[in-house]
Amino acid sequence: MHATTVKNKIMQRDNYKEIMSVIVVVLLLTLTLIAIFSAIDQQGISEMGRMARDLTHFIINSLQD
């Protein structure tokens, strides 16, 4: 009886850790998306397009070296 109780408590703790890990990942992804969209909004679409173009040229030039 005691071993079953201990086993159940360990399983509950593992489930709690797993649920908390999922919650943390979801929160971090949400904050990342908010930061990205906020940056896009502040810079404007044309500015983001210019930055993407510059980054693409940089990557292509780096690969050619």
UniProtKB/Swiss-Prot annotation:
It comes from the Bacteria. GO terms for cellular component: plasma membrane. Keywords: Cell inner membrane, Cell membrane, Membrane, Signal-anchor, Stress response, Transmembrane, Transmembrane helix. Residues 40-65 are periplasmic. Induction: By acid stress, via the EvgS/EvgA system. The chain crosses the membrane at residues 19-39. It is a single-pass type II membrane protein. It is found in: Cell inner membrane. Its main location: membrane. The keyword Phosphoprotein does not apply. Residues 1-18 are cytoplasmic. The keyword Signal does not apply. Connects the signal transduction between the two-component systems EvgS/EvgA and PhoQ/PhoP, by directly interacting with PhoQ and thus activating the PhoQ/PhoP system, in response to acid stress conditions. Interacts with PhoQ. This is Two-component-system connector protein SafA.
